[in-house]
Structure formats: C-alpha cells, structure tokens
C-alpha cells in the first residue's frame, strides 16, 4: 500500500486499551489533524457510535462498521464476512484485517513507510505481547512500568488518553511519558491497586473443573485475565470474570452493564489455542466476541445465573464443544 493508497481519514475511532491507544497514535502520526474518539466493542455494535462514523472515519481495534472508510483490526470474531467485504469495498471502503498480535502492529506496518515511527519501535513488542497473551509470568509478577502504565488507560479518562496520544505523535518515547508527574502518580496508584485487587480476586474466585470463576460484579472492580490466572496458577486452564453492574448502561463508562470476560491461562504450557473461548462469549450475546483466547460479552436475559450455568456446562464438555478444530 503506497501513501496514495492509504485512505483519507479525518477521524479515528479506537478501542480504549493500550492496543487501541497505540493504534490511534500511529494513525494520527500520519494524519495529525485527525480527531480521536475512544470507544469499546459494545458501543460499535449497538449503534451508539453511528453518528460519529462515516467514510472519513478509520476504525482500529474494534468491531467492523459498514459506514467507516477504513477498517483495521485483528480480532477473530471481528473479521468481516466475504459478503460484508465485497459490499464495503464496492462502496469505496478499505479493509485491513490481519491476525497480527495487536491491531497497533497492523497500523504500524501500514504507516511506517510514510511517517516517522521511531518512538514506537521499543514499545511495539510489549503491545504485541500484552494483547496476544505473550506476557510471561515473571513479567507479570514483576509488574514493570509498562504493565502498570497499561492499567492507567481507561475510557473513563479520555482527556488523559488523548494527552498520551498527542505526546506520542509529537515524538515522545513511552519512557519519557512515564516520567511525567501526572503519569507517575497514576503508576503508583496502579501498583497499590493491584495489591488490593489480587486479594479481592482471591476472595471472590472459585474453581470449577479447571475454570476459575471470578465474581467482581457490583463491586466497582474489574480485572484482566492475567491477574486471575496468575493468582490461581496452574490449577486452571481458563477464567471467567464477571464484572459491571446489575443496573449498568453500555454508554456509561463509569457504570457499565453486567459482563463476562473469558481468558485462557497463557502462563501454563500449551495454555493457549486449545479451546475457542469465543464460543462462550457468543453463546447468548450476538455482539460478544474477540479472540479465541481472550474475549467477552454482556450478560443476557434471563440473567447471570442462567448464562453462567450454561457456560459451565459448555466448559464441562469443552473437549467437544470448545476444542479448537
């Protein structure tokens, strides 16, 4: 793809995690005047973002939207169908879907011939590893600066995330950014929060046939799969984390609805790519999905107890129901 072939865009819609932030920053390096909106998968799929997406919008690290002009992603369940791709491209859209370790990596490879991305070179391997389950147990336990930094990123703090993007676009390295007082303060807070959260995970997790079920709903806490699987150790092959609020709303970043996240235990040998956990995420929620090793969904009617019982039953029969073909 030459610079002439890179689609024109004036807006970037990206996921609100480290991968999405880096993807957005890389794209903004190419088009500095583009504005950025951080979102999440459910908002794309339920139509909440429709008014912000048009042919001048590039979407990165989020589900496909037929009204955008350029689509970049790497999630298994987000890959457009052949029919969607044909219709989209006939209308002038460009699809870049590749099974890269991160969506930011895909953006990086597309943009690097045409923009100076030198300050991303040292950052990209970590973003790839974090998003693809490539963090080692030692790296996780050590909880280095980048691990902490990744947890400071949230849709609840869009101004902070945009500040980070603008510094990356201006050429700052991630090491320089992490020394800034407003970032260093957040890093220290995340270190303390993780100690508290690990105890909360211990107190609220049970194991059913090597599936860790962590109940964080209505607590105000959330966790990624790394913390739960590291805490439970080699006694689990995967985890299911319930989070959000019983009265939550998709468009309220501070009080999201009840949801479930599923993660393979990437810390054990052959822990990934054994079971397709996205089949759990899409069992009830047509808008659920992600990767086979890391995915999520919203709790659907008739409710959590019913959904969880079915997921446990599917897990009990995982060697036939979930086993990767």
Task: Please annotate each region the language model reported.
Residues 138-196:
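Accessory alpha-helical/coil subdomains and C-terminal extensions
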